[in-house]
Amino acid sequence: MSDAPAESAPAQIDPAQTDPAEQPVQILPRERSDIPDAVARIPRPPVPHLDPPFALRVARLGDADMVAEWMNRPHLAAAWEYDWPTPRWRRHLGAQLQGSYSLPLIGSMRGVDLAYLELYWAAKDLISRYYDAEPYDLGLHAAIADVKLVNRGLGPMLLPRIVASVFATEPRCRRVMFDPDHRNTTARRLCEYAGCRFLGEHDTTNRRMALYALDAPTTDR
């Protein structure tokens, strides 16, 4: 769906568990540390639900080999710029699983894993520097592993279902954010198809993003 650029404050790294040459690497490069305590205390994002034949589950450390292989495929390496080796992916997944900022997910169809997603609190993420974030705004990044499935209608089919589940599971969330690279026409078309509001293009440290918000439906009483 959208790329996930490396930026923001460094996360804590245990020197005993990392190669000295890798110690300066930020484990969760988009996570902010300069946030209010009330935002920092919000627990990790909810797990969305999808009806069969699709499913979502929380990623495990054992998925690191699979996710690393996916993210080193050319179409995802270009979009995400997270073409890391397995050890770094294991740390990236572990940091998310141990924290409350972002939740890594694996998407499947008929029992076959085919997508990697990250559902994160936007107020804890670098994008909150570029719009007026509410504490329970959520953001979503998604990657379809098989290039043959890209542009085959999976995004338009599944995005509304995932977002509807997010709103149902966490009613305090009133919008879901997307921040594709401004050149990512596929992701931008999907945002527009889903009914997102365009919040402009913004220059970050290493790229220019197009910011979108998908608002929760309102109920007329």
UniProtKB/Swiss-Prot annotation:
GO biological process, alphabetically ordered: siderophore biosynthetic process
Amino-acid positions noted as binding substrate in the UniProt annotation, renumbered to this chain: H141
Pathway(s) annotated for this protein in UniProt: Siderophore biosynthesis; mycobactin biosynthesis
Molecular function GO terms recorded: N-acyltransferase activity
Catalytic residues (positions): D179
Domain of life: Bacteria
Annotated region described as Disordered, given as residue ranges: 1-34
E.C. code: 2.3.1.-
Keywords: Acyltransferase, Transferase
Regions crossing the membrane: none
Signal peptide location: none
Quaternary structure annotation from Swiss-Prot or TrEMBL: Monomer.
Recorded family membership: Belongs to the lysine N-acyltransferase MbtK family.
Role according to the record: Acyltransferase required for the direct transfer of medium- to long-chain fatty acyl moieties from a carrier protein (MbtL) on to the epsilon-amino group of lysine residue in the mycobactin core.
UniProt protein name: Lysine N-acyltransferase MbtK
